[in-house]
C-alpha cells in the first residue's frame, strides 16, 4: 500500500473507494497498485 498526497487510477481496473474519510485505490488484478491518500 502506497501512501500518497494525490492518488489517481493507474489502469481501468482500479477502483476508487472512500473509507473513514480517506480515499483508497484498490485493484484486484494488480494488487501492487494499491494506494491511500495521505
Curated annotation (Swiss-Prot):
The keyword Ribonucleoprotein applies. GO terms for biological process: translation. Keywords: Ribonucleoprotein, Ribosomal protein. One of its GO terms (cellular component) is ribosome. One of its GO terms (molecular function) is structural constituent of ribosome. Belongs to the bacterial ribosomal protein bL36 family. This is Large ribosomal subunit protein bL36. It comes from Methylacidiphilum infernorum (isolate V4) (Methylokorus infernorum (strain V4)).
Amino acid at each position: 500500500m502506497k501512501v500518497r498526497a494525490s492518488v489517481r487510477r493507474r489502469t481501468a481496473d482500479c477502483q476508487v473507494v472512500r473509507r473513514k474519510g480517506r480515499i483508497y485505490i484498490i485493484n484486484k488484478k494488480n494488487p501492487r497498485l494499491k494506494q491511500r491518500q495521505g
